[in-house]
Amino acid sequence: MSWKRHHLIPETFGVKRRRKRGPVESDPLRGEPGSARAAVSELMQLFPRGLFEDALPPIVLRSQVYSLVPDRTVADRQLKELQEQGEIRIVQLGFDLDAHGIIFTEDYRTRVLKACDGRPYAGAVQKFLASVLPACGDLSFQQDQMTQTFGFRDSEITHLVNAGVLTVRDAGSWWLAVPGAGRFIKYFVKGRQAVLSMVRKAKYRELLLSELLGRRAPVVVRLGLTYHVHDLIGAQLVDCISTTSGTLLRLPET
């Protein structure tokens, strides 16, 4: 399955590939096979910034990266390296335990500063971005870590929660969060179900990828068909099958 997907996805979405005969094919994505960094960059281009008035940093999901880097071990290792280098942040989106959002650190910093500008919690947020963000790449933070290591008072932590920079994980523990991401999560969950339903309603519960992408998206698919298809493939919610007519998406047998 991985081998098939590795060859199918660049063919369908995105590599300008020169053949021995025939014209050069051009597709929306042009990621470099095997590079998580390139995959993240290309997927970021699909994020509809205008939908959120550019208030959110572009967000892609780990599952989407798997659609372009099908070897999950390689993808996870490369993402971990980017995380340790401070280039990306990974956040828990909350609607699923495996729902990890990936954001470029500089985009995150810029949008958060803009969102808190002039607010009562701006000082706490600036302190967090200057001290915690560069030093700790974790998805969550513990109370002793915040108070003893980074010197935050309880009131400052409350400010960070109010600002949407942290969300409560459990008593004395917080997830890193993206201010204002609730609307994105709502759109993502509804859009995923809608695109999955398009495949489910097709004859034999299968649909050519080219046909799916050529259809008019349902109103609830606010993030775009291509954005969601990468998720469905990478999350293994559909199987990819090579046919003479192109890549076929089929719901797995249950």
Swiss-Prot record:
Outcome reported for the amino acid change (mutating residue 186 to N): Weakly impairs DNA repair
The keyword Protease appears for this protein: no
Keyword Transmembrane helix: no
Tissue expression from the record: Monocytes, hepatocytes, epithelial cells, T- and B-lymphocytes.
GO cellular component, one term: cytoplasm
Region Winged helix domain 2, residue ranges: 120-179
UniProtKB keywords: Cytoplasm, DNA damage, DNA repair, DNA-binding, Nucleus, Repeat, RNA-binding
GO biological process: one example: positive regulation of Ras protein signal transduction
Effect ascribed to mutating residue 248 to A: Increases cytoplasmic localization
One example GO MF annotation: kinase activity
Placement of sequence motif Bipartite nuclear localization signal: 4-21
Region described as Winged helix domain 1: spans on this chain: 32-104
InterPro entries found in the cross-reference section: STK19-like
Pfam families: Stk19 (PF10494)
Outcome after substituting residue 200 to W: Does not affect DNA repair
Segments of this protein annotated with the region Winged helix domain 3: 180-254
Induction of the gene: By ultraviolet radiation (at protein level).
Family of the protein in this entry: Belongs to the STK19 family.
Purpose of the protein: DNA-binding protein which is required for efficient transcription-coupled nucleotide excision repair (TC-NER). Acts as part of a TC-NER complex which assembles and interacts with RNA polymerase II (RNAPII) when it stalls at DNA lesions. TC-NER complex subunit UVSSA binds to the GTF2H1/p62 subunit of the TFIIH transcription factor complex, tethering TFIIH to the TC-NER complex. WHR1/STK19 then interacts with the XPD helicase subunit of TFIIH which guides TFIIH to DNA downstream of the stalled RNAPII, ensuring DNA repair. Directly interacts with RNAPII and also binds to downstream DNA.
Quaternary context: Monomer in solution. Homodimer; when bound to DNA. Component of a transcription-coupled nucleotide excision repair (TC-NER) complex composed of STK19, ERCC6, ERCC8, DDA1, DDB1, ELOF1 and UVSSA which assembles and interacts with the multiprotein RNA polymerase II complex when it stalls at DNA lesions.
Designated name of the protein: Winged helix repair factor 1
Organism: Homo sapiens (Human)
Lineage: Eukaryota, Metazoa, Chordata, Craniata, Vertebrata
